[in-house]
Amino acid sequence: MNSKAKFPNSLPISISTWTNKFINPMKYYWLLVFTTIATVSRATDYTIETSQPRQTIRHFGASDAWSMQSIGLWDNEAEQEKIADWLFSTENDAQGQPKGIGLSVWRFNLGAGSAEQGRESQINPGTRTECFLTKDGTYDWTKQPGQRKFLRMAKQRGVPHFLAFLNSAPVYFTQNGLATNTGRGGTINLKDDCYDDFARFMATSLKGLEEHEGIHFDYLCPVNEPDGHWNWLGPKQEGSPATHREIARLARETSKALTEQGLNTQILMDESSDIRCLLGVHETDWQRGHAISTFFSPDSTLTYVGNLPNVPHLIAAHSYWTNTPVPYMKKVREQLREECKKYGIKFWQTEICIMSNDNEIGGGGGYDFTMKTALYVARIIHHDLTYADAESWSWWRACGGDYKDGLIRVYERQQNARDSKLLWALGNYSRFIRPGAVRYQVTSPKQEDPYGLMVSAYQNQDGKWVCVAINYSNEPQDFKLSFSDKKKHTWQIYRTSDTEGENLKPVGIYKGKMQLSALSISTFVEK
């Protein structure tokens, strides 16, 4: 050592001061580094509990209202084919990337005739519908041609299930001669002597579509959002309120009409506008509240429909208005699950889009192509499936304009369409979780974070497993997936994120643990 070297005690500061200023900070720096490394390497373990099956998943879907009627009439057939592929295809391209989201149920809006009335319908042009039934009582099977084209395109691409729903009875049968309620009150807009006529119209229409288009309808919803207070404010779009007694009466007539036509179509009750209307009285009165007990308790003698041969023991409703605050979203779905269990019925979520109270993403106005809306909706899907035990899940409109109600943004004048991250986010579920899959419980040592990781798992009928992991956070998250039976599985990962091209993109093979990208949805498919 050079004898002229300056030792610490020759510095103008003391040894203790030098140590506190220079050595201790370095010690804490390295301690922080090692702690961070240890934290990063310690991935959260999510365990699929193979002995804890939950509900059977029937399908994922969307509806043809209202855009498919006009899109189906475009001259640009290539664009129609592209849209149909995005919605219905289960094929992959040469790189193994899905061409579409593989919807497994398609909701067809059976029209009431407001389009034929034109301006006198008091309904916005874009939400009017044609009717197969004509004034003279005959049927015109050339009506609703755009919608029928997409029925065929869906079937050609292998969609296995079809559902018909109505917002109004045909205008010939309504009390005001319109397909909208025009503020007339909270009772059904249907003449008292036309219940059987309305039922025959529905059955005849489904029979005709089967004969002319080769489409069999598995399900029929005679009413739509009958408890929605908007339904008796009108006019804006087709719609009618109804009391539970009126709905039960219509269900009985519809049951007879379907049987007479030799159809095994099932009648769904009752497409409530808000799941809170299933549990109690919400923004309405007793005649439209407590839908579950009203329709499925034998003690409800005037409204019980559980004894009808073509009414399955399930309730269909819409998840609007119940997605914020986030803790409440979970709570109300758990309440719904317990109420369904009490009466021995299942739950289907048949319609949802972004509404004005979805403040976290700025409400429904203005289309959003990004993961902001996609992640928000994925969180709703996760809650509906894992807390409400929904057996079926459907988005509202397949295609729409400058509002957050369409999976695909369409430009009518240009006759073209643009996909969105929302479309592919639904595909993280619909493309890989096929009809008949069973959801299994997933456990973790950490409490689920609706702003972080949300994980659910499913086993398809072919025995292959599927796991969907949502990373809602702005940071990558370490992730480890295992099974309670300790068996090893190899997974192909498909990711949707804001990264260009990551629309169900295959991003590698998973065997142990990995890091989930920030603001992404990853689907793990067993190889």
Outline where the language-model segments fall:
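Hydrophobic h-region of N-terminal signal peptides that target proteins for export
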Residues: 32-42
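Noncatalytic carbohydrate-binding groove/subsite architecture in carbohydrate-active enzymes
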Residues: 207, 237-374
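Aromatic/acidic polysaccharide-binding cleft in carbohydrate-active enzymes
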Residues: 346-431, 440-446
